[in-house]
Swiss-Prot record:
Monomer. Can also form homodimers and oligomers. One of its GO terms (molecular function) is ATP binding. ATP binds at G8, R11, R91, R143, R146. CTP binds at G8, R11, R91, R143, R146. This is Multifunctional CCA protein. Catalyzes the addition and repair of the essential 3'-terminal CCA sequence in tRNAs without using a nucleic acid template. Adds these three nucleotides in the order of C, C, and A to the tRNA nucleotide-73, using CTP and ATP as substrates and producing inorganic pyrophosphate. tRNA 3'-terminal CCA addition is required both for tRNA processing and repair. Also involved in tRNA surveillance by mediating tandem CCA addition to generate a CCACCA at the 3' terminus of unstable tRNAs. While stable tRNAs receive only 3'-terminal CCA, unstable tRNAs are marked with CCACCA and rapidly degraded. Belongs to the tRNA nucleotidyltransferase/poly(A) polymerase family. Bacterial CCA-adding enzyme type 1 subfamily. Coiled coil: none annotated. Residues 232-333 form the HD domain. It holds the Pfam family HD. Its EC number is 2.7.7.72, 3.1.3.-, 3.1.4.-.
Length: 414
């Protein structure tokens, strides 16, 4: 029985990066051998075992073959006769198909076992598939795209791009379950340069299948006086990357991705203006969230940003009444943290333009001040003062909030 660290741990050590992955493969063992050594079996589809002390997962070396469409359509074989090279050949990329022995202290020891040229591709900053078996699992397209967002200086080998296109053309991407698509997209959004993920998905044609609402933004013009980058798709990528550069949360990054979807449906005779794109975008966003089963925190923030980002940008022109209505529509009094994240997404939108990355965004501080002023109003006391006239409560509370905002910001109520 020999234990190896495989994949990310070896790759990241060679790159001089802290490892986010720790996967182990055991060669020359049977399930009975593992249990006899104190490991606990947990795998459903193939033998995976928990270490008796660290609880880390150890998988028996295995081979696999395709049996059906989709990422679950595989049959596996594990046995003491499966070699390390046979296990590594089923992996996605050469840079992930390397192994190294581990000692009793979990240190990587001995030579790097690299039968498929992973070290060469690391040096060349290249993503290359190990074998044509790559085509058997469509999730690998998403994984390559996600790796591109993490290792954004890497490029995809031309032959790998061609193979990814074949997978897309064969309809394999359409068979992916929504939860797995969202899992990979959300991971990619949280990497250092999320735009690279979408670049790769566009290059192989997968984005048009997975997120057609986003894919159609490329080539859609915007007014150059507001958007020197002109292309809407380019703008959205700049917005996502800005959000990533300030360490924004997943909901903010998703909102950044989805804020301008409505521009993809602007009538041609209206271009490069996009009147009403916010409302059109909300409908498209709802469809994406339902299709991919997007978590509620991401969905709710993205909807607020898609609907209100234009008003938030223009809010420096608003009086106290309009500011208060905007704060109320955003539900900022009940959900102040979400409101702050909406403002961050809008700041990313404003700065995600050519030449605007360092521009001030006074709208955020102004709206936060308006929110705080509106929140200072004692709605309970107003309700009590209204007595039986309950139909007046909402209007009186709103007027009190407007007055508080006007006083805080030193402006007229209208």
């Amino acid at each position: 029985m020999q234990v190896y660290a495989v994949g990310g741990a070896v790759r990241d050590q060679l790159l001089g990066k802290p490892s986010q992955d720790r996967d182990y493969v055991v060669v020359g063992a049977t399930p009975a051998d593992m249990e006899a050594a104190g490991f606990k079996p947990v795998g459903k589809d193939f033998p995976v075992f928990l270490h008796p002390h660290t609880k880390a997962e150890y998988a028996l070396a295995r081979t696999e073959r395709k049996t059906a469409v989709g990422y679950k359509g595989f049959a596996f074989y594990t046995g003491a006769d499966v070699t390390l090279e046979e296990d590594l050949v089923r992996r996605d990329l050469t840079i992930n198909a390397m192994a190294q022995a581990v000692d009793e202290h979990d240190n990587l020891v001995g030579p790097v076992i690299d039968p498929y040229g992973g070290q060469k591709d690391l040096a060349a900053r290249k993503f290359r598939h190990v074998s044509d078996a790559f085509a058997e699992d469509p999730v690998r397209i998403l994984r390559v795209a996600r790796f591109a967002a993490r290792f954004h200086e890497f490029t995809v080998a031309p032959e790998t791009v061609a193979l990814m296109r074949k997978i897309v053309d064969a309809g394999e991407v359409d068979a992916l379950v929504p939860e797995r698509v969202w899992q990979e997209l959300s991971r990619g959004l949280m990497e250092a340069k999320p735009s690279r993920m979408f670049d790769v998905l566009r290059e192989c044609g997968a984005l048009a299948h997975l997120l057609p609402e986003l894919d159609r933004l490329w080539g859609v013009p915007q007014r150059p006086e507001y958007h020197p980058e002109v292309d809407t798709g380019v703008h959205v990528m700049m917005v996502i990357d800005y959000a990533a550069s300030v360490g924004a949360s997943l909901p903010v990054r998703f909102a950044a991705m989805a804020h301008d979807l409505g521009k993809g449906t602007t009538p041609e005779d209206m271009l490069p203006r996009h009147i009403g794109h916010e409302q059109r975008g909300v409908k498209l966003l709802e469809a994406i969230c339902q299709r991919l089963r997007v978590p509620n925190d991401c969905r709710e923030l993205a909807l607020v940003v898609a609907r209100e980002h234009g008003n938030i940008h223009r809010s420096t022109e608003f009086g106290a009444a309009a500011l208060t209505r905007l704060v109320e529509r955003c539900d900022a009094l009940r959900k102040p943290e979400r409101f702050a994240e909406a403002l961050l997404a809008c700041e990313a939108d404003a700065r995600g333009r050519l030449g605007f990355a360092d521009k001030d965004y006074p709208q955020a501080d102004r709206l936060l001040a308006a929110r705080d002023a509106a929140a200072s109003v004692d709605a309970g006391a107003i309700a009590k003062a209204c007595g039986d006239k309950v139909d007046q409560i909402k209007d009186r509370v709103h007027k009190a909030r407007v007055a508080a905002v006007a006083q805080r910001l030193g402006m007229a109520e209208e």
